[in-house]
Amino acid sequence: SGQFIFSDNSQSYFNTHMSTYYVEAPSTFNELLLSDYLEHQFDNPRQKRFALAHRLTDTYFHNFITHLLEAAFQRRVYNLIEAGETLGANKLNSIMKEVLTEFWGDAVEIDDDAALTWMRQSHYYMGLYSYTYSAGLVISTAGYLHLKNSENGARDWLNFLKSGGSKTPLESARIIGADISTDKPLRDTIQFLSDTVDQIIEYSKELEE
């Protein structure tokens, strides 16, 4: 992918791979660029609303909710392993169904097929990889907002990609103006989501006129 081209060309062999903490950030950053582009390309409020709705459902829901539930499943599995228990497919299915049921309550009916979703992607369970999706999305949101609000935003994002693994996640995030030693990037992300919802509501009102 693109970030590895930048880092390969800018770093030594030993520093080309960026931290797992934010390795998914470039892909979700591109998703934000796409939804922004579509919103501003369309003239019809319905199409604009469509673009922003997919930002919420495809980018944020998938990375903040779906992977959160997979991480919760993973944590329970690890706890059982540390307790000396042996796990088979049936046990893993029951754990996943339990996690989904506790999260959704009576709002969503969880069937036996949903319990199989833990086996979708094996790399989700490589070194707590599930957590990188939400962490990376906070980073990509910070980069996107920096791009929109700073004349140097594009340059800084490219420098972020070029940094590869030469810096710590804390240092790399600072290239795009994000201090992840605080909760501000997360709070900014939450505010951005709120603003997106408000804009969707405005487009809906336009359609009702």
Residue ranges of model-derived segments:
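Short beta-alpha connecting loops at secondary-structure transitions
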Residues: S10-M18, A53-D58, Y78-L80, R120-Q121
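Short, glycine/acidic-rich hinge or "gate" loops at secondary-structure transitions
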Residues: S10-T16, E39-L52, S150-W157
